[in-house]
Amino acid sequence: MDALLKEIEKLSQPSSLQKENNDVCDLCFMQMKKISNYQLLCEECGQLKDWFEPDYNEKFTVYSRLKIVGANSSYHQRDLDKANSSDYSSLQFHHILEELKSLNVKYMDAGQKPFPIQVLKETAHSYNQVQQHRVIRSITKLQILASILRSICLKLNIACTVADAARFTQLNTKGISRGMDLLRSLFEDNKITLNVDLNPIDSFINSTYSALQIKQIHQELQEENVYNLKEIVKSFIVYADEKNIGVDLNRRTVVIATMYNVLRRAYYPIEIDTVVYQCKIRKNTITRALKMYEDYYSHFKSLYEQYQLNAAKKLI
């Protein structure tokens, strides 16, 4: 009996093949080389293969995912995944986090500002929550990751457009509507706590303020005035939305144009070329948004007067 127990215990340990990573290529059957924490490369034919080595914990006799094969396997796999040990959920979290870190490096290499590690961790955690309720495959996974990333950023007041999120996950299109719809349905059913319908205005105001370096340029600007400036910009945008003015314009563009308009009318010496350069936006794009304030001047005049701004129809 003791010999049998020892044999069972031996079988439950990770084998030498698993430790040495002797995975073979499906195409040429050559041994594949580990090139990252989640990818293998066949040096013979160049095929890449997703892979992840879990941290083995002797407390658990099962440390890898159990898979059901045969008829109706996908139907029963969901129940098995939910019933599996909590260790698997932890492994999945680390797997997704490593994938997000890799995407973050590529995003930074492409000239974009990387996302904070807190955003990546919360994205991985929320994705883990979604996995408990949905079986996710292929392009849907990338759209869900992009949707979660954007929602986490908005929650933390970090600017992130739909295009930014799609670019981060390397989607071929800039649309993430399928991922947003799935997350929205799970939120409405109280299955996840992440709200995907947060207003992005606050995050765009903060990022635009930082990009224009208002505090550095005007050191006499006190914290109270900084708060007032952001609140004034927001009040203009909220008012425009209530009147259905400029609702078809990109939200980030509206924020940048509004802040420039407010600063000019508050007699701050800022030029449109500075805004174009600092905010990385095209001049004709911001000009179209500024035209909104010219075309609907009569609507905004009362706000100019309320906040003691220059209320002239056209600024010189």
Swiss-Prot record:
Putative initation factor. Belongs to the asfivirus C315R family. This is Initiation factor TFIIB homolog. It comes from African swine fever virus (isolate Pig/Kenya/KEN-50/1950). The lineage of its organism: Viruses, Varidnaviria, Bamfordvirae, Nucleocytoviricota, Pokkesviricetes.
